[in-house]
Swiss-Prot record:
Signal peptide: 1-17
Protein name: Endothelin-3
GO biological process, one term: vein smooth muscle contraction
Gene Ontology molecular function, alphabetical: endothelin B receptor binding; hormone activity
Organism: Sus scrofa (Pig)
Region of interest (Endothelin-like), residue spans: 144-158
Encoding gene (name): EDN3
GO cellular component: extracellular space
Annotated propeptide span(s): 18-80, 104-204
Bridged cysteine pairs (disulfide): C83-C97, C85-C93
Swiss-Prot/TrEMBL keywords: Cleavage on pair of basic residues, Disulfide bond, Secreted, Signal, Vasoactive, Vasoconstrictor
Subcellular location: Secreted
Region feature Disordered, mapped onto this chain: 18-71, 115-140, 166-204
Length: 204
């Protein structure tokens, strides 16, 4: 029993110490000298060739319009929410308004991760639409509520309904084609009857 405990203790100590490096072919006679890993050497060489980082030299970068850093390679901060969608099922609206959203798709449901970080009460979140006293269109015609009323692009996006988007994507037909019967040009049925393979086999 005691022998087993000593054996387990020895295994624990050796596993905590880490693996012993193998001697390389050109290391004859230097087996007792500890070597730095090659990855550490490469990292030190890269830092030495790059020089000091821009932050350490005192050059502070200014955040961009939504909080991200405007210049190269700096850490990106969380951007402000541009607007609040009335329904999270409208994915285009969610991607437009919530700029830092990550969607977690599971077989059971699609969860918008990060939307619960909204600052404000739950009641305020539910009543994100315009108040009944306002002269703006009703909630049925709006997709979202903009954080800033001066943001024209956001106001345009939020007032554009799903039906209007669908109508704007379909091309309008000129008046000339309106009177033509449905045929090949307009995507109607082919005038000849298509024959199946069995019909062809009966002929033979």
């Amino acid at each position: 029993m005691e022998l087993r405990l000593w054996f387990l203790f020895g295994l624990t100590v050796t596993s905590a110490a880490g693996p012993v490096p193998r001697p390389q072919p050109g290391d004859a006679g230097r087996s007792g000298v500890p070597r730095a890993p090659s990855a550490t050497k490469e990292t030190m060489a890269m830092v030495a060739t790059r020089g000091p980082s821009p932050r350490s030299s005192g050059q502070e970068q200014e955040p961009g319009p939504f909080g991200e850093l405007a210049a190269k390679g700096g850490p990106v901060r969380y951007r402000a929410r541009r607007c609040t969608c009335f329904t999270y099922k409208d994915k285009e609206c969610v991607y437009y308004c919530h700029l830092d959203i990550i969607w977690i798709n599971t077989p059971e449901r699609t969860v918008p991760y990060g939307l619960s970080n909204h600052r404000g009460s739950v009641r305020g979140r539910r009543s994100a639409g315009p108040s009944p006293q306002s002269s703006q269109p009703s909630r049925g015609t709006l997709r979202c509520a903009c954080a800033e009323s001066q943001d024209r692009a956001c106001v345009y996006f939020c007032t554009r309904t799903l039906a209007a988007r669908g109508a704007s994507r379909t091309p309008e037909t000129p008046d000339k084609e309106a009177g033509k019967p449905a045929g090949r040009a307009t995507g109607g049925l082919h005038p000849r009857r298509l024959k199946s393979r069995t019909d062809k086999a009966r002929r033979l």
